[in-house]
Each structure stands twice: as structure tokens, then as C-alpha cells.
A protein has these predicted regions:
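Von Willebrand factor
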Residues: 1-46, 70-74, 78, 89-96, ...
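Active-site metal-binding loops of divalent metal-dependent hydrolases
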Residues: 99
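Von Willebrand factor type A / integrin I
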Residues: 77-90, 103, 107-195
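Short beta-strand-loop
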Residues: 5, 29-59, 79-84, 105-109, ...
Length: 195
């Protein structure tokens, strides 16, 4: 997510590295779809190459916009294509972010102009779009969503939980503790979803 602070980005990357270890041990395919700026991008298409994914993850930047609806849409498309190829049966989409989107889907898709600098999108419209996208993802056969919430505020917006609920997925708050706790949480959560 582009809206994560640097310290939470390190925690998110720690969670992602734990997931890479789990994927390697399970011989799972993985894909990396960062969402920042105006659009999400498939940085690493489905692969078993942990080394490539780790290298791309290490150099991944954060900041700028958070086109979360586009990221979920890209994850759905990438996962469905992998299913159609016959290489993948079950798809677990792991979304690491705070749930706060600030880029409308039509801007990400290029069907609308980016917002003028200083202009903010309608928050309720963004939330509705995000919830609808999560519901669509959750309705795809063989798909499940794991939402790892990086929000680091005293008063939480609860958006990440709403996304997980809309997709009928699982939700976990990313711990503020150490990498071992993050690794334990992420590996346990993914293991439970694959069972």
C-alpha cells in the first residue's frame, strides 16, 4: 500500500518474506502486485521463483496513492488466469495494507482523468467501490482473501476488516512486535486458509 509509513512498510515486508518462505516450503506459486501511485501492477507474475520475488520485494518502494480496488481486481484476474492454465487450484490473495484507498478504479483503468492535485476523491464512493470489488473477489470459486492490516492508528478506521468481511476472507492485525511474531502470524494464517 502506498499509504503505509516507513516503519509499517518494514513490518509488511517482514510478513511478505515470511509468506515467501512458506510458499517455498509448500512449492506454491506466488505473485507480487504492489499498489501505489494511480494503479496496481503485476510486478511478479505467478512463479515458484522465490529469489526473483524476494529481489523485487526488497527494492519495492512505498508512498503515493493507494489504488486498492485496482490491486484486488488485478489479483483476481491474475489468479483466474493461473487457474485456467491448470497450474493452480486454490488461490489465496494476501493483501497487506491499511485498507485505505484513495485512487478510484476508473482512474486506475484509465477511463477517467486523475484527480487534480489537492483534490480528494469521495471517501464513501471509494469505500463502496472497494467493498464491491472485495465481494467479487470472494465470490470467485477457489479464491480466498487474507487481509493483513498495517493500520497504525490509535483509532482504527476498520476498513481492512470491512474488506476481509466483504470477501468472506480472514483478517489479522499485523503485530507491532518483532519479525518472529509477524512470521508466526502470517504462516499460521496462510496454513489455515490452505487447509
Amino acid at each position: 500500500s502506498g499509504s503505509m509509513a516507513l516503519n509499517r512498510m518494514q513490518a509488511a515486508k517482514g510478513a511478505a518474506f515470511s509468506l515467501l518462505t512458506e510458499a517455498y516450503q509448500s512449492r506454491d506459486q506466488i505473485s507480487l502486485i504492489p499498489f501505489q501511485g494511480d494503479a496496481a501492477d503485476v510486478l511478479v507474475p505467478p512463479t515458484r521463483s522465490i529469489a526473483l520475488t524476494k529481489k523485487r520485494l526488497e527494492t519495492m518502494a512505498c508512498g503515493g496513492g493507494s489504488p486498492l480496488a485496482h490491486a484486488l481486481s488485478m489479483a483476481a484476474r491474475t489468479g483466474m488466469n493461473a487457474q485456467k492454465s491448470g497450474d493452480v487450484g486454490k488461490v489465496v490473495v494476501v493483501c497487506i495494507g491499511d485498507g485505505r484507498a484513495n485512487v478510484p478504479l476508473d482512474v486506475s483503468l484509465g477511463t477517467a482523468e486523475p484527480l487534480e492535485p489537492g483534490t480528494k476523491p469521495d471517501r464513501q464512493a471509494l469505500k463502496d467501490e472497494l467493498i464491491d470489488t472485495a465481494k467479487q473477489l470472494g465470490s470467485i470459486p477457489g479464491f480466498s482473501l487474507l487481509m493483513l492490516d498495517t493500520e497504525n492508528k490509535f483509532v482504527s478506521t476498520g476498513l481492512a476488516k470491512d474488506i476481509a468481511d466483504a470477501a468472506q476472507g480472514r483478517y489479522f492485525k499485523l503485530p507491532k512486535t518483532n519479525e518472529a511474531a509477524i512470521a508466526e502470524l502470517t504462516q499460521g494464517a496462510v496454513g489455515a486458509m490452505k487447509a
